[in-house]
């Protein structure tokens, strides 16, 4: 797999970021058990992240790039965004600080659209927490309204007016931070019937496309310690996600390379091995 994955992937490799439509960005954290002071950490720790980008071809979402990193640090996001030339016109993503920092540094002029599902989910989580801590009729009403708060400007305006009467410090702070983003997005997104398929409001298409990656890697997460090897596995998973996994095409590509190189692959497995005791993803 690690020797021939780049060979079969080459014909489908994207050579630049999409210049039209939207680029959806997110990361998939893979957690393992962890302990501190002899006690288990409930959520474990992130062993590695898989950064994913989805672009659009003829109005249909395609997994553009997938790459594993040891963490979601801004420097790793910068490396991911810099792995291809070009600049997208529009990015849809959640509010991950490392990602946003890297986007701002590399593509300062890009139209940045915060995923509206993640915004609404964050709002609903906040309200649920506040209701547990301090139940009130006002917060219960706001929780009921939150489900449709981001449908459009009118719904958001009604929600914001009711929120002001609740006088909840955490909610007021959330609205102060996020209202400018939400209202700016309302101003430029236009009516739904005029919105083309490659201008989504959420990262739902990315989540759907990358679900098989999670399914494939999660049971193996403890064994995945070599970054280069994992990235070559991700090449095959990308081909599968985009419907390009053809065993006959694979065989032709491998045979062509072997025939051109006296029956030997261009690389050896040892070339991507980690130094003993120094895994690249831990």
Regions found by a protein language model. Name each.
Residues 32-37, 124-126, 233:
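Short, solvent-exposed polar/charged micro-motifs at secondary-structure junctions
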Residues 84-85, 107, 217:
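A broad structural signal for alpha-helix termini and local helix breaks/kinks
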Residues 90-139:
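Conserved beta-strand -> loop -> alpha-helix junction used to position metal-binding or nucleic-acid-contacting
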